[in-house]
Structures are given as structure tokens and as C-alpha cells.
Amino acid sequence: EKEQSFLIQEGFRILDTYGNHPSFVMFSLGNELWGDKNRMNDIIKGYKSVDTRHLYTQGSNNFQWYPCIVEEDDFFSGVRFSIERQIRGSYAMCDKPLGHVQTMRPSANMNYDNSILPNNKVKSNTSAIDENGYIKIQYGTGVKLIKADELENEFIPHVPVVSHEIGQYETFPNFKEIDKYTGVLKARNFEVFKKRLEDKGMLSLADKFFQASGKLAVECYKTELESAVRSKYLAGFQLLDIQDFTGQG
């Protein structure tokens, strides 16, 4: 309760400090949250009572396979509406099924309109729930068991939809960058990767791997972005930009 109170007050401090910033348009309570939906709704309501200029949402990709929209949500941010109704192009193996960028040939017709507003009934992910009512969810880089709520057969959004963390296509390391790390930060990971490749007798192919993986990443991003822009029912997307180490998507 003390931690929750601090986080809620931190939200008010964000509004007070950055509320006038011209780029402060949308406010999400957090990333991939689980918890009390009613409590999240009340928190948003409290923020709106102070500052109504922004668009608010309960979180980004909350409840993963079992998304919902609460009363105070101004938009929805997620990756799917059910196991089959996907709204981005790729998924991790722990978050299957995989997306169209991973499993299909590029298409000039691919879009997410039928996933957002389906013409036909679709399956929900009830098969993933075990006999005790638990389901495995993605948790960090692993999995975690949580109690699954009873699911509705179909979830139709009534607010603008934003696709969450699209992209994430990686490239092979460019070992020529190792010498550029002249400060306190060293490219130890690159050194390990280079040694592994050398041990396998493939170091001479490093540049080709770098070029080929870069070209593949460009094609994947092209397919992903064009599918999103082509979707008339998709209000926008969040392009993940993680650069913890060079080459990460």
C-alpha cells in the first residue's frame, strides 16, 4: 500500500512538473501491468480531476493475453485482443503465436483492421488455462503463473487503438565498433561474440552476417510499419527503441 501510494503521488508530480510540455500528449500508468482493474480506473480518474489535457490509459499491454478497457481509458495500448487477433507483426517465443512478419511472406494487403473490428467470431486463449485456472504469462524474459479471470468470447474496442512495442528486430554485431569504446564502457559482449565466431572458424563471415542481418531487419521493419499504416482502424503505434547494447532492435 505504501509503494502504491508513492507511485500514485509520483503520477501527480509528473503532471505538475511536465504537464505544460507540448509533447506530453498521452499518459500510461505503466508497462505490462497486472492488478486490480477498478483501482487502475480510479487512479486515472484522480489524474483527470487534476489535468484533463492529456489522453490517459490504464497501461501499455496490460493483462497481456486478456486485455480490457476500463471506463476512464481514452485509448487502448496493446498487442492483441485475443490469441488470434494480433495487432503487431512479431512476438517472442514465450508470447506465441508468432506474428505475420515471422510466419508469412511480405504482403501489400496485410493490415490489422479485422483484428481490431472482426467480421467473424474468433477464439480466445482459454486453451492456455490449466485445470486450476492458472495461465503462464510472459514475465521479464521468463514466465510466471497467474490466476486467469473468466474470459469474454470477444473484445471489441470502443476507444482508439495503439499497437504496443512493434519492431524489435535485431542485427548481427559489427565487430569494427569494438575499438570505438575508448572510455570506461567496454564492448565486452562484442568481444565474447567475436571469440565464439572465431572458435567456430567463421570470423571471416562476420561482415557478411552484419550486412545480411541489417538488410533483413530493414525488410522486417518495412513490412511491420506498412501493415500498421495500412490499417484504418489502428490509431497509432509505439515503435520500441531499446539501445541497451548496439544491435538490439
Tell me the role of every PLM-derived stretch.
Residues 1-75, 79, 156, 237:
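Active-site mouth of glycoside hydrolases
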Residues 27, 89-249:
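Substrate-binding clefts and catalytic carboxylate motifs of secreted carbohydrate-active enzymes
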Residues 76-89:
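Acidic, His- and aromatic-enriched active-site or binding-groove loops in soluble protein domains
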